[in-house]
Amino acid sequence: HHSSDSRMTAEPGIPVVGATGALDLELHADALPPAIAARFRHVTAGVTLRAPVAADTLRELHRQQLLLVQEDADGRVLRAARLQSPGALDELYAMAADTGLGVTVAPDRTRFALWAPTARNVALCLHRDGTGPAQSLEPLRQDSRTGVWSTVIDRDLSGQYYTYLVDVHVDGAGLVRNRVSDPYAISLT
């Protein structure tokens, strides 16, 4: 089940509440490829499931609240679990490995790029100094193939202070807006 507004709950004995959609998963009976089995050797043996959808659909789903739910014949929850998606994100956004991240300053422009594949929205906050409020807010656009959010400002912003606002689903809290520093920064205030 998935929820685009992060308000889904799954309690045993009743149907899932607040889902905006569901996806039937397929049992994957084949052995995992050796490279994947080695990478996740710390995960105990269990059922392997497959989502029979295109990569673009999976990318969009990972930006939402996701629950793996086992239901009875009447649609009542038997068991539910949150998904652990780091391995899936690495596979879905492998192209990001070749993308420049952080800030790149040139005489006539400054590019900002942040890898945040599960974010629902990202904005750049430009600050006058390291402690004051944002003076301007610039929306970033996501490249759905890489999960990188970016924008270009048509001027040299050398020495400018900035942070990001990142809207993301957080298990147990819903949709949360975080003000974060640039993880690729070479200096922080």
Predicted region positions:
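Short beta-strand elements bearing conserved aromatic residues within extracellular beta-rich modules
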Residues: V122-L124, Y162
